Amino acid sequence: MNRLQHFLRAKTQFNLHSPFVYGLYTEVLFSRAPGAPRGRYEGALWRLERHYGVAADRRPDGEASFSCPDGDFLLLDHPHRREERWQSVMDDPRWQVTLDFFSYGIAVHNPRLSRQHFILR
């Protein structure tokens, strides 16, 4: 998927019907936090670590993961450059929710959530 296709299919917070994803989107990922790194992936990872008070396990291949009370999180930097890896994460039944922001992707393992894939701006 290229950036234009992603932009045309992507939704904003007003189209989110999952309370967990809406809260994650508005209160964590797009909060205005002073001191946040500039990059989208680094900024999202920094905000998640700060919100949940945990340090992520960062791998050199552009993936990071951590566990918290809301579940297990997996972040992928530039998932569309590694389309096979991102598709395998989306198809894996362990991950209930996947969030595709084009420049980074987030997968969440939380058995209380229904299985959904969100394409977001």
Give names to the regions the model predicted.
Residues 1-73, 79-121:
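A short alpha-helical cap/connector motif
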